[in-house]
Amino acid sequence: MGSLGAILKHPDDFYPLLKLKIAARHAEKQIPSEPHWAFCYSMLHKVSRSFGLVIQQLGPQLRDAVCIFYLVLRALDTVEDDTSISTEVKVPIVMAFHCHIYDNDWHFSCGTKEYKVLMDEFHHVSNAFLDLGSSYKEAIEDITMRMGAGMAKFICKEVETIDDYDEYCHYVAGLVGLGLSKLFHASGAEDLATDSLSNSMGLFLQKTNIIRDYLEDINEIPKSRMFWPRQIWSKYVDKLEDLKYEENSGKAVQCLNDMVTNALLHVEDCLKYMSDLRDPAIFRFCAIPQIMAIGTLALCYNNIQVFRGVVKMRRGLTAKVIDRTNTMSDVYGTFFDFSCMLKSKVDNNDPNATKTLSRLEAIQKICKNSGALTTKRKSYIIENESGYNSTLIIILFIILAILYAYLSSNLPNSL
């Protein structure tokens, strides 16, 4: 759960955090008994706890398909991300990955921590994949093949232009959007979304991750991962790694703001995609990551800490997003809130200020025109008073102690 200091600063985070903790424990108890499916769902919770929670709400067949789709692409991404693997070894693997998923003897040791376990024990994923219906398998194979080919192209090529950037993000994330749309359609729950809208859903998430993960990627050993396009960063520095040096702080923030402004291009498509969804579980599955993305961009914008350490939404705010996101009205309200937060940070002296403000105002107009911005809704940007009396602190301590005792008493004996 969130740290005590964060909870005391934001006490209204407590209930959503409690609900999230209970939901996480419930999800862990829902892991299937079959060995290959048990491995897959267990691994899903390890590589993405929040994704693992949201996926549990999908119908059984679709849930299984999305779980395997995610793990297959996570494994493919693990190969691509491992900078210790030579190009000569890496390219053939990613190119043939769509074939490996049919081979329950195949595995390839790479990555670290839980990702290494995923790769070493990949036969479990293959066995689960083979259990899926044919329409699900065909969709997963097709997207894996196309993604592997795209990754192979950019293993041998740098991201030079904004077009390159969009193409790379299409291969590694836009295709995920296309694949999920195919799975939703195959389940019978949704109409097939257009490729353009599906692609934008993936690009918005991927560009947010690329922005947020600058420092981690540039410091990767033995070789940096560089995804920011030269067409953008070369306006501010001579080399991409120069952005992390303190003497370039001013230019670094301007470059960061340029990158965020580029990512905002996809928001209108994302709102349209989500507004077309009919199934409540699929809607939540799609909407929660998009809200996390706009929230992360609001935190990153004009924030030098992107080049100094980790910038991410606090766990309590994440819990609120998961708890409150149920309808399209919730999405419009949240996008409006975070776009207001972002807008308040725009410096009129920033070289891209006019463009940034124009894109934010377009987003806000869509949200306002939706009719969802009622006075009764809860805002994400109204901060709580930071000072609390000792009685409230004592009460929170007691509640936390009771909760800890309850959860501890219900832990499985093996833990």
From Swiss-Prot:
Any one biological process term the GO annotation gives: response to jasmonic acid
InterPro entries: Isoprenoid_synthase_dom_sf (IPR008949), Squ/phyt_synthse (IPR002060), Squal_synth-like (IPR006449), Squalene/phytoene_synthase_CS (IPR019845), Trans_IPPS_euk-type (IPR044844), Trans_IPPS_HH (IPR033904)
Cross-referenced Pfam families: SQS_PSY
UniProt topology in membrane: Multi-pass membrane protein
GO CC list: endoplasmic reticulum membrane
Coiled coil: none
Listed pathway(s): Terpene metabolism; lanosterol biosynthesis; lanosterol from farnesyl diphosphate: step 1/3
Keyword Membrane: yes
Superkingdom assignment: Eukaryota
EC number: 2.5.1.21
CDD domains, per database record: Trans_IPPS_HH (cd00683)
One term of GO molecular function: squalene synthase [NAD(P)H] activity
Reported cofactor(s): Mg(2+); Mn(2+)
Keywords: Endoplasmic reticulum, Isoprene biosynthesis, Membrane, Transferase, Transmembrane, Transmembrane helix
Location(s), subcellular: Endoplasmic reticulum membrane
Main location: endoplasmic reticulum
Catalytic activity: 2 (2E,6E)-farnesyl diphosphate + NADH + H(+) = squalene + 2 diphosphate + NAD(+); 2 (2E,6E)-farnesyl diphosphate + NADPH + H(+) = squalene + 2 diphosphate + NADP(+)
Transmembrane segments: 281-301, 392-412
Enzyme class: transferase
Family: Belongs to the phytoene/squalene synthase family.
Role noted for this protein: Component of the triterpene saponins (e.g. ginsenosides or panaxosides) and phytosterols biosynthetic pathways. Catalyzes the biosynthesis of squalene.
PANTHER family hit by this protein: FARNESYL-DIPHOSPHATE FARNESYLTRANSFERASE, SQUALENE SYNTHASE
Record-given protein name: Squalene synthase 3
Species this chain originates from: Panax ginseng
